[in-house]
Amino acid sequence: MRRFFVFLLILAFPLLSEAQETITVMQYNLLQYGNYQSGFAECYETNNNTQHKDDCIRTILNYVKPDIFTVCEFGKTQQLQDDFLRHNLNINGISYWKTDNIINFANSSIINHIFYDSRKMELKKHVALRTSPRDTDVYELYFKTSELIAGDTVKLVCIVSHPKAGQYYETDRLATMRTVMNYVEQHYADENVLVMGDFNMYRASEQGYQLLTRTYSDSRSLFVDPLARVGGVGEWNNNATFAPFHTQSTRSYSDECFSSGGLDDRFDFILMSDEIYMGFNKIKYVDNSYFALGNDGQHFNQSIDQNGNAAVPASVASALFDISDHLPVTMKLHLYSQWGVNDMNLGGFRVYPNPTNGLINVGLPQCDSPTMGQTEYRIMNVMGQTLMTGIVEGESQKIDVSQLSNGLYFIHINGLVSKFVKTTSLH
């Protein structure tokens, strides 16, 4: 079946060329798009007009030019999905944007969605996880690289989640993220995975965020926050320190539908598996490419277009203000498999126990052991900082990592990389 699927892709579509090596991903909460029966927000045709939102979306899409566009708060009807494609993506002679059929187990009035450039990728699978108050959607994509000819595929999994909003619903958000992490462990550990959406989290200390990035029991499934290495992780809510990273709200006043208060929360995320962060599986995060579109760091507790905007043109700032109370987040991924380049291998040596609370054992295969019986190791954190170096003697070595803070780490030896989690206690 897999070979037949690959064969059809090769026949039907051109393969990616070197000019298409970078993939742009954008995640956006569209604020009750096409939904006027939410029961939560006072959003009507008069103050959240779909036609005007489409005008804004086209402006933003033309500026960002994403290849993968995932959204939250999209109305649940098939007609709305078809209209969105026709009015905003497949326009001006373009016909390559695709999406998938709606799955809505929760029967929510707003759902998640994905739109993708079918010249570069195809959707193989769409699964909806039963989370509350709405489903979490899992989209498995395959890129059209030259490796398809050999029957190989480069996979990217996009998990779009929109857990419950509000300061008092941390337990609900934790339950949603536990469902996500359990599914990742069962199906996509050690693969290229993005988890994205409006997470409604006020601080990095929230248990749901910690579960995604640090505390989940299977270290293979943990996610990396691209803002970790630039100081973007912390107590985000109403904290000016994190002004460059906030995504909500785009306006300082409310008209009933849009939240007020200006930019003072980081609710919107794209987190990545370490396979993407480090480039283990032929897709690599482009360093420093992650940002909240339109956030110039100068609009803390202000409207996004107040007194101009240094990050985007005025037309884009105006569109961001008009369409939603959230900013979209975007990142770039480098797809390098079509040239057979892979300068970093995952595994090749054992690290155990994993997780660890103090000592790790590093075991090298005999063929990888240096002639003189010694080779250097480096231990790095998710921010790319080297924290420890030393020598592995022979085919095995004990390394004391008790002084490291709890979290995910990478150990580099002889051009190979493995990962481990440091934790305070083992259960």
Regions found by a protein language model. Give the residues of each.
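C-terminal outer-membrane/trafficking sorting elements
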Residues: 344-427
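Short glycine/proline-enriched turn or capping motifs at secondary-structure junctions
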Residues: 3, 321-327, 406-407, 414-415
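Hydrophobic alpha-helix-in-membranes signature
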Residues: 13, 65, 327, 352-354
